[in-house]
C-alpha cells in the first residue's frame, strides 16, 4: 500500500492506494500515530484503495475513536463500501 499525505489547515488527508490488509495496517497506523495536535480532522481518501481486510476496518474504527469522530472517508469504491455496509460501519463512520 502507498500513502500520500497532505495538509490543508487543520485537515490531514491520507490518500490510500493498494491493499489495506494485515501486512499494510502497521504502515497506516504509524501515519495516524504521527498526527499533530493541530489536526482537527482526518480524511482517508480511498480512491486508490483496492481491498480492505477486517484488520483494515479495525484500524479505521480505532482512528475514528482516536479522532473522536472527526474522521471522514472519501471516494470509497462500491466494492469497499459493500464490505463496510456488511459490517454495519456505514451507520457509524462519516463519508464524503
Give the role of each language-model region.
Residues 94-96:
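Short acidic-hydrophobic, aromatic-tinged amphipathic segments that line or gate anion-handling sites
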Residues 1-15:
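Short beta-strand/loop segment at the start of cytosolic alpha/beta domains
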Residues 20-92:
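Amphipathic alpha-helical interaction surfaces in cytosolic regulatory modules
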